[in-house]
A protein has these predicted regions:
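Short beta-strand scaffold segments in enzyme catalytic cores
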Residues: 85-87, 265-267, 673
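Short active-site loop at a secondary-structure junction
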Residues: 231-252
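A short glycine/serine-rich beta->alpha loop
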Residues: 233-239, 423, 601-604
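Small-residue-rich helix-loop
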Residues: 503, 513-524, 562-715
């Protein structure tokens, strides 16, 4: 981030953030300043008073960083000015809301060693953990809290990571698209849920008992414990957060839409169905579903087929009007338009607008290529030559380039790739969706006489279509208003934000952020007949994948109060509206000013948030009903998600299996934020953000924040 950009960042606190001691000393020092005028010796006294006041400032306000963190900063060639940290205790240590810790064991150790938490001595029991905490903290004795532990083999984690990186150049996109099961054993997930459920049930029982006893009396206010930060360093400086910004829309969505919220993609038809043939158009009304993978799209089309339609004498219209004007230049951010993380959101996003290219070597000179999903009326090369080279990202290994009617590969496949999956983003979400739909419809054995038309405007119920002339005699008089045939629910929000925070899925985050604006009940109540009609923006685009030369115009609707097609639909939204809804939520629920956002995923250099802001959000989330879904979406330090390499960078960290973290990385940004369960049983909110004016060494910078997690876990 350029140096001058920091001066443009929004303020991050409404209140005077001067240390309390300094504030209280201000009147006294002013009096000293007045007294120093007649006597030359008094300026020294005034300076001394200010110095004493500064020395009395609380540790959390002007803290020297812990030695371990300072050492890591020095090793990374970073200064204390480059980092903001806030670490705050949260909740009651006897009623933790965090999942049970994960015990990472190493069976390669001698069999006579106990399989307990990893420490500097390899493995050790509670007493040695306590000694290690004392050694590292140089502090008073820590009472080690015994939490129920789930176990997983260290070698299992390593093997899983090796297999992923050997198989694909983009393991996070692969895991999102293919819905790869969690590495953790199922009983670990169930235990964590039961652990938190028992706490919530106990709280409900207590609340119910209280209500029964106090029905005749006024309800007394709930007293919440407020902790001072364990460590606060440059907490109020606005910084670029990178992907830790995903924590903002993902929680606000949970809080406003609910953990069980689902998107409903609805299918309508015009005309009439005779036998298994539709004389009219099939309309797919996009809902903004973040995870309409190619397999789920095929299930949607299969439901249409099961409803009795196999042949369409008309067009398939894709209505993506729920989001408007959200398409971006995929090369604008970092000149990497082929990377799936740069894909644009869309009202009907299919497979993250990305295609999987699988290589299968036939011999030492050639390899066969397959594609998932297939694209209708688009040429995809089936063979590629092999060269001697190391396997890397798609842009280096196969150098793909999207042409109007074909994909070209501008280099030969490295021989070290073997059977490998590359993920490449298509440049146009609407054209991609249209081509995949056409291909899937045909794969199911169905036919389509017209085209697949993807547009950012609703279908026209009263459009004068030339297909009316194709109807059998006498059917032209039948009303053409769209009629519902299929409603296909998405995965619920809890499942969606798992991908967002565990695999740092950018385009899914954008879909969720936009959905906050579209589905928020406060700003967009369920549509009633004749109200909140979908805006038909004149700038909306029209994509026709099957025949790009077609002169057909958009089939735009004049909203009618009696149309089932518009009933119950959310109001169309765009980024300004969605981000305003996020700001309104923040101003209502929290005390600090909202972050500065230009999108939801953190893939931006003009976005900013302070460590104090993010810490307040995480602290608020900890107390909310949707917290289980939120914390379960985060990666586990040294175990899973984008923080799984924590144990490789810091093998003896006490945070392994005890920290639930979202990470963020840009070329000059490294960040981590989430929750840590201390050895004492106390839960902590942790936020660390590193910004520099030039590109930084990401590995070394991450180690600084790894050390922050380790230091916190020792408490």
């Amino acid at each position: 981030m350029p140096p001058d950009d920091r001066l443009l960042m929004l303020p991050t606190s409404k209140t005077d953030n001067r240390p309390t001691t300094i504030t209280k000393l201000t009147p006294f020092t002013k009096q000293l300043y007045t007294l120093n005028k007649p006597a030359k010796c008094l300026p020294t006294l005034s300076s001394l008073a200010l110095f004493v006041g500064a020395m009395l400032t609380p540790l959390c306000a002007q803290a020297a960083l812990p030695e371990a963190i300072q050492t890591a900063l020095t090793h990374a060639h970073l200064s204390t000015a480059d980092i903001s940290i806030v670490i705050t205790p949260v909740g009651d240590k006897d009623a933790s809301r965090l999942p049970a810790p994960i015990q990472v064991i190493d069976s390669t150790k001698p069999a006579n060693q106990p399989e307990t938490l990893t420490t500097d001595d390899g493995t050790a029991g509670p007493s040695s953990i306590q000694k290690q905490a004392l050694k590292n903290n140089n502090a008073k004795e820590v009472s080690v809290h015994q939490s129920p532990l789930m176990t997983i083999e260290k070698q299992t984690i390593k093997q899983h990571a090796r297999q992923l990186h050997a198989y694909t150049d983009d393991p996070y996109t692969y895991q999102s698209i293919e819905s790869i099961p969690s590495l953790l054993p199922e009983n670990a997930l169930v235990s964590a849920k039961n652990h938190n459920s028992s706490i919530k049930d106990s709280a409900k029982d207590n609340e119910s008992s209280k209500n029964n006893n106090d029905k005749s009396t006024a309800h007394s206010p709930v007293i919440k414990i407020s902790f001072s930060p364990l460590l606060s360093h440059q907490a109020n400086i606005a910084r670029t957060p990178a992907s830790t910004m995903k924590l903002v829309p993902s929680f606000i969505a949970l809080d406003t839409l609910g953990a069980d919220f689902v998107w409903h993609t609805r299918v309508y038809h015009t005309g009439i169905i005779i036998g298994d043939k539709l004389y009219g158009d099939l309309i797919i009304q996009g809902s903004g579903d973040p995870k309409m993978t190619h397999e789920r799209l095929q299930q949607l089309l299969y439901k249409v087929q099961s409803a009795g339609i196999r042949h369409i004498n008309g067009d398939i219209i894709v209505d993506s009007a729920v989001f408007k004007n959200v398409t971006k230049d995929p090369a604008a951010f970092d000149n990497s338009p082929l990377r799936p993380y740069n894909a644009s959101p869309d009202g009907f996003l299919v497979n993250f607008s990305s295609i999987g290219i699988q290589s299968y070597p036939l011999d030492n000179t050639r390899a066969q290529l397959t594609y998932t999903p297939q694209l209708a009326n688009y040429q995809l090369p089936s063979m590629i030559n092999i060269r001697s080279a190391a396997c890397g990202q798609a842009r280096y290994s196969i150098a793909p380039q999207w042409q109007p009617t074909q994909l070209t590969l501008n280099t030969n496949l490295p021989n070290s790739c073997g059977e490998h999956a590359f993920y490449v983003a298509y440049p146009d979400a609407k054209d991609f969706a249209a081509r995949v739909i056409a291909s899937k419809w045909q794969t199911l054995g169905n036919t389509l006489s017209g085209k697949v038309i993807s547009q950012e405007t609703p279908y026209s119920a009263n459009n004068t279509s030339d297909k009316q002339t194709k109807l059998p005699r006498g059917l032209a008089a039948i009303a053409m208003s769209p009629l519902p045939i299929v409603s296909y629910p998405s995965l619920n929000l809890t499942q969606q934000i798992y991908d967002i925070n565990h695999f740092s899925n950018n385009v899914m985050t954008e879909q969720v952020a936009l959905s906050i604006g579209a589905y928020n009940s406060t700003n967009n109540p369920i549509n009633k007949a004749g109200s909140n009609k979908i805006n038909t923006d004149k700038a909306s685009t029209n994509k026709e994948s099957v025949n790009n030369k077609s002169s057909d115009t958009n089939k735009v609707i004049n909203n009618q109060a009696t149309s089932l097609y518009q009933f119950g639909q959310p109001k169309a939204t765009d980024y300004p509206q969605a981000l305003q809804t996020i700001n309104q939520w923040w101003q209502t629920k929290l005390t600090t000013p909202p972050p500065h956002l230009s999108n939801g995923s953190g893939l931006c250099r003009d976005c900013s948030i302070s460590a104090a802001n993010l810490s307040e959000l995480l602290t608020y989330a900890y107390e909310q009903p949707s917290f289980d879904a939120y914390v379960s979406s985060l990666g586990i330090a040294g175990v899973s998600g984008t923080i799984s390499a924590h144990s490789e960078r810091l093998p003896k960290s006490q945070a392994i299996g005890r920290a639930w973290i979202k990470t963020g990385t840009l070329n000059n940004v490294t960040s981590m934020a989430g929750y840590v369960k201390g050895l004492s049983g106390q839960d902590y909110v942790v936020v660390g953000i590193i910004n520099t004016d030039q590109a930084l060494n990401a590995y070394n910078a991450r180690t600084v924040l790894d050390t922050m997690l380790d230091w916190t876990a020792q408490h």
